[in-house]
Every structure is written in structure tokens, then in C-alpha cells.
Amino acid sequence: MELENNFEGKVVWLTGASSGIGKELSIQLSSYGAKLILSSRNEQLLNELKLTLQNTAEHIVLPLDLSDASSFPEKFKYVTEKYGQIDFLIQNGGISQRGTASESSEEVVRKIMEVNFFGNVLLTKTVLPALRKSKGQIVVVSSIAGKFGFFLRSSYSASKHALHGYYESLALEEESNGVSVTMVCPGKINTPISTNALAADGNKHGSMDHNQETGMPVSICVSQLLKAVAKQKREVLIGNKEIKAVTLKRLLPRLFWRVIRKQSPT
């Protein structure tokens, strides 16, 4: 598949662009000729990333805090004045969790939901008029944790489950307007997501999970992701053997629970 045909000259707003899957998306999309709006909270990392991308002058850095929805209209106005259109909104920004449900503070629960769910959907609502105009596509980077719960990820899993319900509904509603939605469910991918995850007390987890260290290389993950986007798939599972758990849960739920309780939380 020639991905240049799908992304060349297209305007892509990407959240969570400064690291992990978002950073690799920036690299690969720029190689296909896309024009990128690079967003995350870390402006310094975004500026450093932009300098490494192909066609540097075509991209802009736009710092964005998903917990500050009041800033979205102004950011949206800036993007549309700059580019005149938005073809893809890739919702990759978010925060993970490494703490038990019983010990995680209310602040942690609310912060995860605010960033992963409320900020995500409110940005989509802000950008939706432009996507209707361009007959564009929303890409939501969820997780296999959006398909089943797992140790130390209660609020994270809840936020991802919520995204699936919201965007499955939105996809049905917006199909007649020409807007498509692709849900991406990565499994164990070699990114620093666990390092930046929130512990039960709200501090950073601060270490790399073994599951992440031994996970699928992020370049392969993103390559598969972009192929799914180009095909306008409604949903794609990306990872190694762990993604088989989704099918196992659906077909043999009792066996699924016996297997999953034996897995390492990290």
C-alpha cells in the first residue's frame, strides 16, 4: 500500500506527539508528506522533534494540555487560519496508571478521566466542524485495556472503555457527514508509557515495565496503525500474542479470566 497517496499534503493534528507512539507517528507521517500540527504539553520536546522531521517548514508546534478544554477553541482557530483545513485528528494524548483501585486517590481517578476521556472528546467536538468539511477521519489511540480490565489500571481501563462507547456512537452519527472513525487498540508496545504513568499517590510510576521493554517495536506498531487508518478500519488491535486475549474473552470468557489473573501486572 502506497501510504503517500493517503497522507501527502493532508493536514494532521496529532496529540501526544512528543514521545512514544505519537513521536513515531510524527516521523512516519512526515515521511509520507503530511502537514503536522504537533501537540502535547512539552513544547521543548515538540520543537526538538520538529527539527528531525522531513519537510520541517510544513509543520507547526502547538502546545496543548488536554485537561484545559477552555483553550481548545483558540487552538482550533489558530490551526484553521494557518492551514484552512484539518483532514485527520489523531487522538493519541493520554496518561496511564500503575496503582490499585483501592489505593488510588480521587485526584488520580479524576485526572486520568479528565485527560483520557473528557479532554479527548471535547477536542473532537471542537474540531468536528472542520472534519465534516474535509470529510476527514478521527483516529483514537485507545488500548487493549479498553477491551478488558487489568491489574493496576482501573481508571485507565475505565477511560479507554468510555472512549469506545463514545466513538462507536459518534461514528454512527457522523457517517452521513463523511467523517470516519478508527479505534486503535495497542497491546504491549515498547514506549515509555509506563514510566510516565500515575502511581496511586499521583506521582509518576518512574520505571519501565518489563512488558513494555519486551513489547512490539513502536515503528512496527505505527506502520500497522497507519495502514489501518488508510483502509478506514473501524477498529484495529496491534501487538503480539497479548491481543489474542480480546478474542479469548469474547469466545471463552471463563478461560479468559483464568488466564488473565496469572499475568504479570507489569
Predicted features along the sequence, with ranges:
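Substrate-binding pocket helix/loop in short-chain dehydrogenase/reductase
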Residues: 100-101, 105-110
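SDR active-site lid
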Residues: 176-240
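The beta1-alpha1 cofactor-binding region of Rossmann-like NAD(H)/NADP(H)-dependent oxidoreductases
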Residues: 63-74, 106
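Conserved glycine-rich cofactor-binding loop
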Residues: 18-19
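Active-site helix of classical SDR
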Residues: 124, 159
